[in-house]
Amino acid sequence: MAAVSLSVSTVKPLGDRVFVKVSASEEKTAGGILLPDTAKEKPQVGEIVAVGPGKRNDDGSRQEPEVKIGDKVLYSKYAGTDIKLGTEEYVLLSEKDILAIVA
């Protein structure tokens, strides 16, 4: 099997899935204490970098996604599949797991 080179530009989500670049988590507490990786909360905010074509309805038509590339979103804590490309972290999740668009 040939090796596949993954990059953000080669990932095309299917159906109602979106590919989100995870925002960096806090390294320190408000009091200045450095947090080890095991104590950090999983980030729930990120920027959409790719969007699938949308969910298929019962009649076969596509439902347009409510989000677009560049939107900053808040998503469910345990949603999606975590993916690391180089030094950046991403999550591939279903549009239904997005809770809000952050202005």
Swiss-Prot record:
It is found in: Cytoplasm. GO terms for biological process: chaperone cofactor-dependent protein refolding. Its main location: cytoplasm. The keyword Lipid biosynthesis does not apply. It holds the Pfam family Cpn10. Coiled coil: none annotated. GO terms for cellular component: cytoplasm. Keywords: Chaperone, Cytoplasm. GO terms for molecular function: ATP binding; metal ion binding; protein folding chaperone; protein-folding chaperone binding; unfolded protein binding. InterPro entries: Chaperonin_GroES, Chaperonin_GroES_sf, Chaprnonin_Cpn10_CS, GroES-like_sf. SUPFAM superfamilies: GroES-like. Belongs to the GroES chaperonin family. Together with the chaperonin GroEL, plays an essential role in assisting protein folding. The GroEL-GroES system forms a nano-cage that allows encapsulation of the non-native substrate proteins and provides a physical environment optimized to promote and accelerate protein folding. GroES binds to the apical surface of the GroEL ring, thereby capping the opening of the GroEL channel. HAMAP family: CH10. Heptamer of 7 subunits arranged in a ring. Interacts with the chaperonin GroEL. This is Co-chaperonin GroES. The gene is groES.
